[in-house]
Amino acid sequence: MANVHVINHPLVQHKLTIIRDKNTGTKAFRELVDEVATLMAYEITRDMELEDIQVETPLQTTTAKTLTGKKLGIVPILRAGLGMQDGILKLIPAAKVGHVGLYRDHDTLEPVEYFVKLPSDVEERLFIVVDPMLATGGSAIMAIDCLKKRGARNMKFMCLVAAPEGVKALQDAHPDVEIYVAGLDEKLDENGYIRPGLGDAGDRLFGTK
C-alpha cells in the first residue's frame, strides 16, 4: 500500500506480541506501549532534514550535523493516544504537544469531537498524529481534518495496529499523510473491532472497563 510503513524491527514485533496478549496487565501494557512508541518514533523521524554546522570539540573545530527544517508536534487522539505521547517525547523532547479529543459512538461507529487544543504555530510544524489503533479510520480522518482546518499542512499518522479497511479509508481521505504501523492486521469484525487486534487500548492502558 502506498504511504504505509510497517515497522518490522524485531524489538517492535516482540513487544507488540506481549501487548496483544490478553494476560498482559495494565502496568506492563502501559510500559510496552510507551516503549514501542519510542522505537516507532525513531523510524518516523528517519527522513528529518539535517544541515552542517561548525562545532568546537575539546580538540578542534569540526563540521557536524544538526536538525533543520520543520519543527515537530505530537497530537495524541484522546484518550488512548496519550499512551504513546511520552514515548515519543523521550526521543523528541522539544516537540510541542496538541490534543484532539474524540470518542467513538458504539451505535454508529462514527467519531464524535469533544476537544481540540493545538500549538499556535500549526503551519510551521510537522505533526505526528498518534492513536494505538486504526480501525474504521474515522477517528484518524477526523483528527487530521481538525488539524488541516486549523492550518496544519504536514502530518504523519502512527499506530500500533491497523485494519486494512481503516488504512484504505485514511488513504482515500488524506492521501498526503503517511501511515506508520507496527502490525497490519487481518480485518474488522461486524462490531468494528480489529482482528486479531489487542482489545480496547484505552481500557487496557488505564485499567478501565
Swiss-Prot record:
Cofactor note: Binds 1 Mg(2+) ion per subunit. The magnesium is bound as Mg-PRPP.
Catalysed reaction equations from the record: UMP + diphosphate = 5-phospho-alpha-D-ribose 1-diphosphate + uracil
Protein EC: 2.4.2.9
Cellular component terms per the entry's GO annotation: cytoplasm
Gene Ontology BP terms: UMP salvage; uracil salvage
Keywords: Allosteric enzyme, Glycosyltransferase, GTP-binding, Magnesium, Nucleotide-binding, Transferase
Root EC class: transferase
InterPro entries in UniProt: PRibTrfase_dom (IPR000836), PRTase-like (IPR029057), Upp_B (IPR034332), UPRTase/APRTase (IPR050054), Ura_phspho_trans (IPR005765)
Residues where uracil binds: 194, 199-201
Molecular functions per Gene Ontology: GTP binding; magnesium ion binding; uracil phosphoribosyltransferase activity
Sites where the protein binds 5-phospho-alpha-D-ribose 1-diphosphate: 79, 104, 131-139, 200
Regulation: Allosterically activated by GTP.
Pfam families: UPRTase (PF14681)
Similarity comment: Belongs to the UPRTase family.
PANTHER family linked to this entry: ADENINE PHOSPHORIBOSYLTRANSFERASE, URACIL PHOSPHORIBOSYLTRANSFERASE, CHLOROPLASTIC
NCBIfam families referenced in this protein's UniProt entry, alphabetically: PRK00129.1, upp
Its job: Catalyzes the conversion of uracil and 5-phospho-alpha-D-ribose 1-diphosphate (PRPP) to UMP and diphosphate.
Protein name (database record): Uracil phosphoribosyltransferase
